[in-house]
Structures are given as structure tokens and as C-alpha cells.
Amino acid sequence: MTAKTIRHYLQFKDFSLEDYEYVLERTGILKRKFKNYETYHPLHDRTLAMIFEKSSTRTRLSFEAGIFQLGGHAVFMSTRDTQLGRGEPVEDSAQVISRMVDIIMIRTFEQDVITRFAQNSRVPVINGLTNEYHPCQVLADIFTYYEHRGPIAGKTVAWVGDANNMLYTWIEAAQILGFKLRLSTPPGYALDMKLVSPDSAPFYEVFDDPNEACKGADLVTTDVWTSMGFEAENEARKQAFADWCVDEEMMGHANPDALFMHCLPAHRGEEVTAGVIDGPQSVVWDEAENRLHVQKALMEFLLLGRLKH
């Protein structure tokens, strides 16, 4: 594979609508194989390097189990244990690591790190999470919606809470997949427009009142108020976000059959009440499991392209 043919997955916008239609279809197929205990090893003897600067439960488990279920192997690499954590240039690490493995997943702080890594990699690189974007999680959310309600095109998604990596990824997804995003963030925590494409403006709307943002929504979603790396702001954020807790009253403004999602970990009583996240509209456990299935489809697609089936 030459450098020109390598595809990376660093932001949601890296794939086209047609790519997503294929990957979502493959996700459903791979999930059915998993549920039926079918052996399927298209990535036999392929190796995934997992580089973690930010710790994780769901990201590590889903990628490590996923590559194993596809017949491959995973190598866990922490910046505490590698030269990346000792000051080796990202570009040099990318050159070395990509000569020894078939695909790389990175979970780190700055998007610039993963961008530079991909620019110097001989193999596909996947964004497992950065401060700016979280494409694998939103892809899992989209598939979860599809499972429960069908295509998300033309639907309305409400985002309540912090303007974080999830929200910026939802904005990109709205533009590509053709749904409307209604969002509400507290004063002082508005969108950083440097991370938002002007072309996406028709696909999202900003509301001061989170209840207003939820009106007519088919899906209501949120995240923690304090993301990893912002712990020093925790107390200030708790005060600022107090009215942005998704509770039963707020869900009442959404459509009666609206779903609730949260990428986890959740803090009951902060960004969401127990009554909502543990209630009948919540699909958070399906959402968490689907990280496994969408990432298997993603790795298969990046390494093998479109399969004839």
C-alpha cells in the first residue's frame, strides 16, 4: 500500500456519505456474526497498535476485543512506556511504529498530534479521541439510532451541555448525514468557531435555553460537564452547567419516542438524572456496545476497502 492510497479516520468528515452507508451496513453484518458466534477472521495476523495518552475503558476494550475477533492482534502502548512520552518527535514515532504494524489507533489530547502522526504513517491511523473530535463514538451513536429508529437523515438531534469533542463531531455528522442539530451550551462555554466549518451552518442551531433545544428532538444526547484534562475547572463548571442537566422535564420537550444517549462515563445528578439515563428512553448500553461493532467495521474498511458480498 502506498502513501497515496492510505486512508485515515481522524475526523467524521474524513468519510463520505457513501462511505458511511457502507460502514454502517458492515457494522450490522459484523454485529450479527458476533451475536451468532460466527468465526470471521478477515484481518488474520494483522496487528493494531493502540497508543494511549488518555486512559480509557471503552476505547481500549472495544478496539482490543474488536481486532482479536477479526483474527488480528493488538499491542497496547502508553506514552508512559514509549519514547513518545520521553520527547521523541511524533513524526519519528509514526515512521517507526507504522513499519511494524498494520493499523494504529491513538487516543490523545491535541488533534495536531494525531494529524502529524498520520502525515508520517505508512498505515491507517484512527482517532480514538482527542480534545477536539471523537468520531468513533459519534459513529457508534449513529448506528445505535439506526438500530432503534432507522436512518437519521432528516431527523433532529439535541445536544445539551459542553461544547466539547462530541459536539464538534456531531456538527460534522449533521452536515454529512443530513440531519438537524439543535444545541445549547451555558454562557462562557459556547462553540469555538475555529473548529466549526462555515459550510455546516445550515445544519445546526444554537439555543440559550436547553429545553428549547430539545423541542421536537428525535434524539437527546449529552456528555460529562468536565472532560479529561479540564479537571481544574470542575467546580466552576458544576455551577455554570447546573441548568443543563438532562432530566425528565427536559426530555418531555422532545418527541415522545425520542432516544437518550450519553457516551459515558456518566455522573448521575450532574449532566443527567438517574431517571433519564436508567429510564425507558435511554439506549446508553447499546450505544456503548456498538463501539465494538462500528470499530470492527471501520478497521475492516480501512484495511480491506469495500468487500463484495
Curated annotation (Swiss-Prot):
Entry keyword annotation includes Amino-acid biosynthesis: yes
Keyword Cytoplasm annotated: yes
InterPro entries to which the protein is assigned, alphabetical: Asp/Orn_carbamoyltranf_P-bd, Asp/Orn_carbamoylTrfase, Asp/Orn_carbamoylTrfase_sf, Asp_carbamoyltransf_Asp/Orn-bd, Orn/put_carbamltrans, OTCase_ArgI
Compartments, as annotated in UniProt: Cytoplasm
Domain of life: Bacteria
Annotated residues for binding of carbamoyl phosphate: 56-59, 83, 107, 134-137, 263-264, 291
GO cellular component assignments: cytoplasm
Known pathway: Amino-acid biosynthesis; L-arginine biosynthesis; L-arginine from L-ornithine and carbamoyl phosphate: step 1/3
EC number: 2.1.3.3
Pfam families, per the entry: OTCace, OTCace_N
GO terms, molecular function: amino acid binding; ornithine carbamoyltransferase activity
Enzymatic class: transferase
GO biological process: arginine biosynthetic process via ornithine; citrulline biosynthetic process; L-arginine biosynthetic process
Keywords: Amino-acid biosynthesis, Arginine biosynthesis, Cytoplasm, Transferase
Family, per entry: Belongs to the aspartate/ornithine carbamoyltransferase superfamily. OTCase family.
Cited function: Reversibly catalyzes the transfer of the carbamoyl group from carbamoyl phosphate (CP) to the N(epsilon) atom of ornithine (ORN) to produce L-citrulline.
Name of the protein: Ornithine carbamoyltransferase
